[in-house]
Every structure is written in structure tokens, then in C-alpha cells.
């Protein structure tokens, strides 16, 4: 019997506790506020001696918060529905400038009795740039906003809005009220006059009503703002109620004169006659401002206008471009210098990607499109006739191949050209090969790059409508995209020729170690000279060493091609491979690439394969001929390593190669033309 009575007692006790969560609750502040007993304040919020809740003072860019100290149970269970609630408060906003203020007041229902993440200015102390709009905020608010913020789609600079987890109001309206005749009357939030606000939420219909009226007037029957939103998914079981406010650049004071709140019942009506009085806002300060401040502002505006004119003139000179009549046909390929300047953030050293003999390259992001680009600044002295050169640039820009760095266009100004390329995020190949790189490429990645560069060079030589001689094929001119595909870049040295024409040049351009002997002798750049450079590139990638290295310890010059040939002559050509590649590589493929590099480095241009043949060898469509220096000694054709790299005889069934008769080394061949 006793056990049964005890069970009934505990059941009744816990049922009583459970039911208590659904009971009504109300409070009212009619005679001023009394922190910290029943009110928690943060930021610049204070309570004046006569009991006014002063959310902000005349400090700029600050926030202020005030919350009822005890949590309120809005739901019977975490997954339950929100109970009905209502609130009423009287507020006033006083700004140092009669026509400007910042930034308003918000009634808030929040999960904590503070909003430490709230920013000042347009965020009214509620949210910040990062969390504005997050569902995890669990914040319901009614804002009295005095600043127009286009980012939040504000109605105007004098509006009331219903906010749920975001400052983009679900519903808003210009501040005002509907009188008994059904006419809308405007109210000015920053009028310095007290006004009353009512907020009502019906838990059954999910209807939210916000109503306003001037001080000492009854609550209008028609609400100012209405929205239907179920707050059950927004509010947690226990929440805090209070106010948030913030200042911007204008000195403003935000006051709460009285406040009442009710849960599961109407908020108690405020005893307006008992509310603390607002301080006297002396008009002297306003007149003083106009008397002293306005002349100062006028002077400031005059000087600002002069500064603005000077700035515009200087800006126009700064962004001045050269544009001639003949360039109009290339308009779509021309970039504005102003856009390139802002894209590269003023061509600052921080964005410098690299510097070469023909100019510096900067990274940039085009404004608006957010396209990542690389901008190369080239002096006018590095071109032919300007019209001819620009025509070539535009023509190159029409190329489309996955292994070429896209040339997007150009800009011309003040004795320099700016060439705009697509940006390659992984930079140039050379940084993965030399000087103990932090990140190295394995053989699969290297052969992928080699195939890509070969494909791009073949496109330039044979697949496009005009022959393009690149002139500077080397690892530093091979760029890697996001997937480590090799893309041939730097067409600043390229010349275009019609198919079948005889390419001529007046001076030698290129890089020592990649220049073919006949190129240094005659100054003529051909497809064969590009193949020679590609041969040096093959050895460079496979060995991880530069074609020519000056060794300070021995005061000697290291020649990569001589070194590789010497190892081949000893029957140990694989000893030339880059040790950084590791052991997991196709040795037959590495050997083929090394021998192909030697073949392409032949001092006789007629003995070098075309890029079409090179691609066949690399793809395995054709087998590289057996290249054995021992087999060549009987025919009087052999590689000279120490005494010279004079002759390279190749045993082709087609007998396409001819040897040299001299005894010069590769270095001598490159400098003297192979004679």
C-alpha cells in the first residue's frame, strides 16, 4: 500500500513539474530597470540614474545588449511547438545629427543572454558577416532599422522588419501605423520622440504581428507587419529575451523606457505615466553644429572636390593607353590597363610570378569574372613593327590546344606591351626539377608532361594554319595546370610564318643550352631548331639537371648532353636518370626518352626527327631505332664526349642521317654552328 501511494506521489510530482513548463509567465518594467538583479547588460549598455535602459551611447562602432536574466521555457520539449508570447516596449532614438542615425534597435529572442559574435553598424549587434543567415543561430528578432543596407534588401532607412536567423527580413515595412480611419501614418524612428511597439506570436496559427504607435496612443487594431512562420524549428526549448543595438559612424543614443513580456498570455500593458523620462535634448548642440560644423564640412567638401579632380586627372594619366586606328579590329582581344592593374593589385612584387629577359610575369584575378590570369609586361624594344607584332599576338590568341597556355589578349601603353595568359596554378616545371625541390614528379608525371609538350609543339609546327616557331622550348617555359598537365607557354619569342615560307630572323633569341648550332651560326629559327631545344628539354626532365651548369668547385662547365652520351657509351645510360624519381619507373621508357633526347640534340638538323616522329616514338606508335655508339665506329661516325661531340651516326634503315667530319664537342657545336 505504501509503495502504491509513493508511486502516485512521484507521478503527481513529476507531472506537476512537466505542467509547470507550460504555465504562463509575465513581467513588466514600468519604473525603470534594475540590473543586475533582473537584467543582464553587455557592451556599452548602461542604466541611467532615473532607470532608463540606455542601449548605446555616443561611441561609434559599438554594440549594446540587455537580456532578462532568467531563461524562458518556450517549448514543453525540445521537439515541441513554441508557445504563444507577446511583448511591448517603449523606445526612443536620439542622434547628434537630426537627419542621420545609426543603426537601430532590435527586440531579440536568443539562445544565450549575450550576443558576443554580433558586429556593430548594419549588423545591429545581432550577427556578423560569417554567421548571418545560419540556421544554427536560433534567433528571432524584430528590428527597428534606421540605415538603408542594400546587402540585406532593406525597404528604406526607416523601417521595421521581422528577422529569423538573418538580417534579411522575412517581412518588413516603413515605420508607421494605421489609424482608426484606416489611413497609414508615417513615424520617424530617429525623431527623438518615444514610441511604442507590440510584438505578438500566436502558437496555434504561427502568426507574427508587429504593431507601432506614437507614445500615449492605444494599440492600433491593424498591425504594421505580419508574417506567418512556425518558430518551432527556430527557437530552442529555453531562450532569453531582450534587446540589441549598435552604433555606426554617426553618434546615436538608443533608449528603452519600459518593457513588458508575457508567455501564454498577453504582455501586461505598460503604465506609460510611470515610465522614466527621457533626458532633455538641448537644441543648442544642434545649432552649434550648424554654426561651426557646417562651415568646416563645407571647407572639407571643397578640398575634397579639389583632391577628387586631381585624383581623376592623375588616374587618367596613370591608366592612359595607346590606341591607334588600326587596333580597332583587334578590340575584343584587347584588355584595359585599368582592369589589369586592379587584377594584379597594382603589379606589386607580392604577385610577381617570375622575371625573365623579356619581362616580368604577375598573377592577377580579373574583377567581375574572377578569372585567374598571368600578365607578362614586355618592353616595346622586344618586338618588330608594333602593328605586325599585335597582329601576331591576336593570331596566336586564336590557337586552341590543351597543351598550350592560352593567350587571352594584350594591352599596349607607355612603351610596353602586356600579354595576358590563362593562369597555371602549379607554376613552371623547372621548380620541380632543380635545387632539391620540395615536391618532385615521379616518372609517370614526367612522361605525361613530356607527351603534352611534344603534342603542343607538334600543333605549332604542323597542325595549325600557320607554322609557329617557338624559339625557347625549356622547362621554365612549360607550365603545369591543376592536374599537372604540361602546357607550353611564353609566345613572346614566337614568330609566325606561312606554311612553305623561308623563316628569317635578324638576331638570335633563346637560351644557352637549348640553341641549335645552325641557329647560333645563321640566326635562322626553324622547326629543326625547336626540335633541338626539345631534345635538351627531354634530357632536362629525365635527368633533373640543366643543359649547362657552371660548377664553381671545379671551375668547369657541365654539359648535360655530353654527360648522358658518355654514360650511354659506357653502357650505363640509365645512370643519368634523376634519382629523385625513385625506383618505380619504366626503365625502358626512361632509356628511350634519354636516347630520343640525344637524337633530337644531333648537331645536323637533317638528322633530327620531326615533332610528328617524336610523338610516334613517345606514344609507342613507332620504335626508336637502335642507337649504339659502338656500332657506329666502323662507319667513321661517333659521339665525341671528352674530345668533342662531333658526329652522331644513326643506323636507320632509311639512311636519313649524315655524320659530321669535325671534332668539336657539343658545346663547340652550339657556339660555332657544328662546323
From Swiss-Prot:
Keywords: ATP-binding, Glycoprotein, Kinase, Lectin, Membrane, Nucleotide-binding, Receptor, Serine/threonine-protein kinase, Signal, Transferase, Transmembrane, Transmembrane helix
Extracellular side: 23-291
Residue numbers annotated as active site: 472
GO cellular component, one term: membrane
Binding positions for ATP per the UniProt entry: 353-361, 376
Stretches of the chain found on the membrane's Cytoplasmic side: 313-675
Region forming the signal peptide: 1-22
Keyword RNA-binding: no
The Protein kinase domain, residue ranges: 347-624
Transmembrane segments: 292-312
GO biological process: response to salicylic acid
Glycosylation, residue list: 57, 79, 112, 134, 153, 186
A GO term, aspect molecular function: carbohydrate binding
Reaction(s) catalysed (UniProt annotation): L-seryl-[protein] + ATP = O-phospho-L-seryl-[protein] + ADP + H(+); L-threonyl-[protein] + ATP = O-phospho-L-threonyl-[protein] + ADP + H(+)
Subcellular location: Membrane
Gene3D superfamilies: 2.60.120.200, Phosphorylase Kinase, domain 1, Transferase(Phosphotransferase) domain 1
The enzyme's E.C. designation: 2.7.11.1
Enzyme class: transferase
Superkingdom classification of source: Eukaryota
Pfam families: Lectin_legB, Pkinase
Membrane topology: Single-pass type I membrane protein
Chain spans, region Legume-lectin like: 25-261
Family: In the C-terminal section; belongs to the protein kinase superfamily. Ser/Thr protein kinase family. In the N-terminal section; belongs to the leguminous lectin family.
Identification of the protein by name: L-type lectin-domain containing receptor kinase IV.1
Organism: Arabidopsis thaliana (Mouse-ear cress)
